[in-house]
Amino acid sequence: MAQDPPKLEPEVHKPPPSDAPLPQLAVPAERRPNRKTNGKGVQTEETRICVVMVGLPARGKSLIASKVVRYLGWLSIPAKTFNVGQYRRTNTPTPTADFFDTSNAEGERLRKAAAEAAVNDMIQWFDDGQGIIAILDATNSTKARRRWIQNRCEAAGIETMFVESKCDDEDLIMSNIKEVKTTSPDYKGQDPELAAQDFRNRIRHYEKVYETMDEDEADLTYCKLIDVGHQVIINRLKDYLQSRVVYYLMNLHIKPRAIWLSRHGESNFNLEGKIGGDADISERGELYARKLPELVRESAGDMQLTVWTSTLKRTIQTARFLPFEKLSWKALDELDSGVCDGLTYGEIEAQYPADFKARDEDKYNYRYLGGESYRDVVIRLEPIIMELERSENILIVTHQAVLRCIYAYFMGSSQQQSPWMEVPLHTLIKLTPRAYGTVEERWYAKIPAVSTWRGKGSSAKHQEMQTPEPEGSHEVRTPELVGKGNKDGMLGVKEGLGLGLTVEGEAKV
């Protein structure tokens, strides 16, 4: 007598294993206990931390701030950047360098007012219960300004941790100046060379009054990053979350670089509509594997990359023609679908209808019986993210769910949307992190493949891709277009896909 299949019990909000190193805070408000914890038994009910950036212009402060916020959000820790420059631009949108001269009384008044407004909004943000960690992004270049911030935060019951980026590497400073003159809102629409000269003059004004953090501020909590992490000085860390931020900072570098992402070539399981497994690539997947080196040359030129794959055959087969060093990571293996491994979505819906529905309702937290959730994948990917931040130019060939999680980290995409992103086969993605956003580019192999994207409630078998052919083989998305389209980048959620793209120089929304 045939036995009924085992019941697949959803574990929608089950926390990760007890040895997981990350705080778990993304629990719906109605299910939160009176005493909040961060998943490690550390009380966070009253935890409010202001990370105060310190340093001269062109030292990567805004890039560091944006990375920290993205990292914390990726780990379900609510965080927000309060950029004093944005407040200042309300009254002075395009100031010249003279505005930052300390002898300019009106400029000094407006800059102090901007700092006041940013700190006030930050305190209100904490009081409204919207987050746990705020980043105050500004030069905060004098001891007097830092002490003022410390006193304001202390009066509001907010811990402070100062993060100073101190850099004397002229090549890196010039690289940052080059980026600022082309991406900073202060110089939008201006001649790049005139913008660079004005920005250098601004730096000189700050250099006149700049005071690095030293023993005079030994009572403060701070992390001092010298020459892009070549030396790190840590003083008076107080709690777990501060140590998590410092751990991340110690793995950062702010040198210009890019990350390339690609799924494996189409697999035989893709053709059959099955999930998981360790299938070989199909004939069309083999064509993509042979085409991939050409796409990489188009996007990277003569640059030497390191290729990371999972340990599964389809990624190793896809990467085998690439003329670079290759490393296989178990952490890059596809999301483990447990007892559903090797099934189609139609079979999962037929055998486990309640569980099929439960996963659609909370795809990020739902864990397959004997398998993983997207949250679990994020946890095992943290070492990968740290290695990516320490490395320079990496090409990752891996799987749909894993790429969704990595892409969400770099683009700051929400947990609600990242599991529903469409990551097409036979496409190379290049991400270039910058201070004011991540530039995304795509190269299309134009080799047919099935679409493995599934909408909520759908159990349809994988079909040939129905997405329109791009006008060219190359698309670019710049940070300025984020406000016009989907903030989650090109890998949009299909429901209400609103992309702002630049296709071969032609803007499209």
Regions found by a protein language model. Give the residues of each.
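Pre-Walker A adenine-sensing motif
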Residues: P33-T44, Q124
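Hydrophobic anchor at the beta1->P-loop junction of P-loop NTPases
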Residues: M53, I396
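A glycine- and Lys/Arg-enriched "phosphate-lid" helix/loop adjacent to the NTP-binding pocket
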Residues: A97-R109, R152-T212
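Phosphate-coordination/substrate-recognition cap region in phosphate-metabolizing enzymes
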Residues: A138, K143-R147, R152, G157-T183, ...
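NTP-dependent small-molecule kinase module
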Residues: A2-K7, E11-H13, P21, K40, ...
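Conserved substrate/cofactor phosphate-moiety recognition/catalytic segment
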Residues: S62-I123, Q130, D169-I173
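Acidic, low-complexity terminal tails and accessory targeting/binding regions
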Residues: Q24-L25, T37-V42, D214, Q231-A258, ...
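N-terminal pre-Walker A segment at the start of P-loop NTPase domains
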Residues: P17-T37
